Regions:
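Radical SAM enzyme [4Fe-4S]-AdoMet core and its adjacent flexible, acidic
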Residues: 1, 59-60, 99, 128-132, ...
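Conserved alpha-helical substructure of the radical SAM core
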Residues: 2-118, 122-123, 323, 337
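Short, intrinsically disordered, charge-biased short linear motifs at domain edges
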Residues: 28-33, 242-246, 290-301
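The −1 position to Zn-ligating cysteines in a subset of zinc-ribbon hairpins
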Residues: 37, 41, 257, 306-309
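Cys/His-rich zinc-coordinating "finger/knuckle" motifs
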Residues: 44-45, 49-52, 265, 282, ...
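Conserved residues at the C-terminal ends of beta-strands
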Residues: 48, 79, 130, 198, ...
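Short, charged, surface-exposed secondary-structure boundary motifs
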Residues: 115, 137-140
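Flexible mid-to-C-terminal extensions adjoining Fe-S/redox cofactors in radical SAM and related proteins
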Residues: 272-386
Length: 386
């Protein structure tokens, strides 16, 4: 189980090619949001708080193909919104597969049962099922009862039909290591390939702001979880759909800075600056403009107040992959022994900004209606001097 060898090989070859060409910045995963419309309203989601004019927008098949052709990443993660609402999603997925890209189709599973017939099992296609814990925890997270049971049934059906399936789990405040361990046991029993797991990012537009983990609490939770995992002799092994060094970072053992260009985001507004998570920083018209004109040094923990508690894989997985190429023996040790679960944690990045009041992104009215345009002020923070 875990990431298939063919995918590991293709990604490793791609990274090596970029390094041999001397490229400092290159993408690993294209984050594609072809729509923001969703059939759930999760408490911790900051992606769907838009008027109908925006929720009704879609990226076309041609726009999606142009995005992957422009950036060239070996992996595409299709998010949203709920991607299965998009009527052209089968053609979009097939277009990526024909280009030899590994596709993770993220879904809450509510539509997958009846849409599964539109797809064929392939080593290049994975259904990434949103599953935020055990039944009680997940249903509370998505604000609807019965969704967990739907996910379980759909996972079993997809696995029976030969599809690759992973679970995508976001952890929030109040969760305990034993509770997460119980979820991991459930996920492994369902036969998923692995679990993508990370602390939730505190979206400014999320309906609830009291559910997000702080950075220190996140690290301790993962240490406690991995400690439980190491004590499970004779029980089913846990598989994560992430690199060993990223998991080691979650446990507080690596002092990583984020690599936002590793997961560039294309959505209905354009190429989102600087990453998948930050809303309100503006958009580039082209991938080249995103890479060349984004002020990357303004972002990251210690560099921007919006980034301070972020430990999400879309920012740090690329950092971990690069570190594995620089320090293969370290990566091998962590892969064999697992993340360290005691001792001092790695130091946090120094704060190099002075925080100033930051207005929330807002919708701009025009005439009698609301236009489909988001005001996107640049973060108002300055580097500290001296």
């Amino acid at each position: 189980m875990g990431v298939p060898l063919i995918q590991q090989y293709r990604v490793a070859r791609y990274v090596l090619e970029q390094k041999l060409r001397g490229r400092r910045r290159y993408p690993l995963v294209l984050m594609l949001e072809p729509l923001f419309r969703c059939n759930l309203a999760c408490a911790g989601c900051g992606k769907i708080d838009y008027p109908d004019e925006i929720l009704d927008k879609r990226l076309s098949v041609e726009e999606c193909m142009a995005a992957i052709d422009d950036c060239g990443a070996p992996i595409v993660s299709i998010a949203g919104g709920e991607p299965l609402i998009h009527k052209e999603m089968p053609q979009i997925v097939q277009g990526f597969i024909e280009r030899g890209k590994f596709v993770y189709l993220c879904t809450n599973a509510l539509l997958l049962d009846r849409r599964m017939k539109d797809y064929r099992p392939s080593p290049y296609l994975t259904f990434s099922i949103h599953l935020d814990g055990t039944r009680q925890r997940h249903d509370a997270s998505v604000c609807r009862e019965g969704v967990f049971d739907t996910c379980v049934a759909v996972i079993e059906k997809a696995r029976a039909q030969g599809f690759r399936v992973t679970a995508n789990c976001t952890l929030f405040q109040g969760e305990t290591a034993p509770e997460v361990a119980e979820f991991m046991d459930i996920a492994m029993a369902l036969g998923v390939e692995g679990v993508t797991i990370s602390p939730g990012y505190s979206y400014e537009r999320a309906p609830r702001q009291d559910v997000f983990l702080k950075r220190r609490a996140s690290k301790q939770l993962f240490r406690d979880l991995f400690k439980l995992g190491k004590s499970r002799r004779g029980k089913r092994q846990w598989y994560f759909n992430q690199s060993p060094l990223y998991l080691d970072f979650l446990a507080g053992n690596q002092a990583y800075e984020c690599t936002p260009w590793g997961n560039p985001t294309r959505n209905v507004f354009g190429w989102q600056k600087p990453c998948y998570l930050l809303v309100g920083e503006g958009y580039a018209k082209t991938y080249r403009e995103l890479m060349e004109e984004t002020e990357w040094e303004r972002y990251g923990t210690g560099r921007n107040p919006k980034c301070n508690d972020c430990m999400v894989h879309c920012g740090y997985e690329a950092t971990a992959v690069n570190d594995a190429f620089r320090s293969p023996l370290k990566a091998l040790r962590v892969m064999l022994a697992g993340p360290r679960t005691d001792g001092d944690m790695a130091p946090e990045p120094a704060i190099v900004y002075r925080e100033e009041p930051l207005p929330r992104p807002h919708l701009v009215g025009k005439g009698s209606g609301t236009v489909a345009t988001i005001a996107a002020p640049v973060s108002r923070h300055r580097k500290a001097s001296g």
